[in-house]
Amino acid sequence: MNRLIAAPVAAVFLAAVPAHAALKVGAQAPDFSAQASQAGKTFSFKLSDALKKGPVVLYFFPAAFTSGCTLEAHEFADASADYRKLGATLIGVTAGNIDRLTEFSVSECRSKFPVAADPKAAIAKSYDALLAVYPGHSDRTSYVIAPDGKDILAYSNLKPDDHVAQTLAALKSWRAAHPS
């Protein structure tokens, strides 16, 4: 019975608390390595390696297989070709375990981009992307990181609606100033 009550109460708190991103535009993005999965296959993801190929869109989400996170994953999957055209690597990160994320990478990310496990939320903490009311879980925060490792966008909003639009706009602006 308590679990039946806890989920709706947590949802109300999550919706009522504004999200924030503390990693400022222009700040150096912390490097990290994590177990990730794409299309059901696990591998090691390292931010500094991805940045050698171009900008990185790093988005944190609270939990796999929740309604908002599923919607957001679908939106990122639908826009994955746009990110590739802009030369960007897209990766989602959450405080889940790799087995659950391997399934999520196929069903909700539609095998279009990787998701990484941050089981102790250390990566989220280094980006100041933790949910204040739900310790150990990532906030819904998106970053665009230039190849030099500098943050060019920090966007936080618990609603998943604008994360794709915000990150694509930042990438297009950066790409216009840095043609290939």
Give residue ranges: language-model regions:
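Bacterial N-terminal signal peptides
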Residues: 7-16
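Sec/Tat signal peptide C-region and signal peptidase I cleavage site
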Residues: 17-21
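A short beta-strand-turn-helix
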Residues: 33-55
